[in-house]
Amino acid sequence: MIAAMAVPGRPSSFGHSFGPMAVVPSLHYAAGRGKEHPLNFLAGYQGRFLQCDAYQSYNAMTEITRDNGPWRLIYCWTHVRRRFVKRFENEGSPIAEAMLRQIALLYQVEKTVRGKEASVRLAARREHAGPIIAALKPWLEAQMSRIPQKSQLAEDIRHTLAHWPGLIRFLNDGTLELDTNPVENQIRPIALTRKNALFAGNEVGAENRAMLASLVIRRENSHWTVS
């Protein structure tokens, strides 16, 4: 697995491998996607927030006992958006279309404060994104009475509501992000070549590949010369 974790004050995100990240990801190999891997990897780390997709293994992070308290999961609005994009493209759902418009409004708020101090981001979010979020949850709940409960759209709405606390934590902390895009963009070259690395020979080979991939990404971000 390759993942990215941030230092305090930076967002954290897990993809398909595990590793610490200050400015760029550090990639580490794990033999699977079970909960033991993020638990072991982050043992001893005193961060508070873990930004991730909704993969169920990360739920275990909220149940552990630490001096700093359990991890607080921050979920990704881009992953939510993808669900409703699919519903709109495949079914032409007006509910999905309306949901996409609301998500777009959240990102418009983010665009105005991108790169600014956390306090500025937090103030803008509370003023402009807060009312959108406040109206969005009851609206989603109301849509559930209008659609078949076994439909995929109903499942997408249930999924969104089930992860609501982690989706709205960005309203209370200006250092958090709406999504995992910063990390996903960093590890995209690795993800695009994953089929070329299905057979690493053994676990040592996989660990070495993760280490080399980390160096390549760091070079791209730091303009190092590798010889």
Question: What residue spans do the PLM features occupy?
Answer:
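Catalytic center-proximal scaffold of phosphoryl-transfer enzymes
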Residues: 1-227
